[in-house]
Amino acid sequence: VRILSGERTPHNNPHAKGVFFGLTHQHGPAELARAVLEGVGYALADGMDVVHACGVTPESITLIGGGARSAWWRQMLADISGQQLDYRTGGDVGPALGAARLAQLAQHKEAVFSELLPQLPLEQAHRPDAERFARYAPRRETFRQIYQQLLPLMSS
């Protein structure tokens, strides 16, 4: 469970803590790094589940931010979530661009949304691989179970 400063969507738990589960002598720094990246993917997929439960089913989701620069990680996230994930030109500055676009919307309330906020050019679409998705599914369930079982210990 990769949590270092609390958990946000969908758990909203500022007391959540991170743990590594199932370590053996065979695990080294590479496996720990991969576990952190997978944990982020499981948490992202949990957030996507909430969106889907609200009746919103996007065809694809655009990844933004510095971490999204890694095509390898983007593919891992698609494989974990089972969702197509897109990377667009300028995605590494997406958070700042998103904030600027929200400011534009606040200033131009009557503007046509699609004209004010055009979609950035698609660089790469990451479609989930069915075999890897099936491999991640039980790990994701373990992630959920560990989080739930550790909840009573996280607030202390």
Language-model segment annotations:
Residues 1-156:
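Glycine/Thr-rich phosphate-binding loops that ligate phosphate moieties of nucleotide
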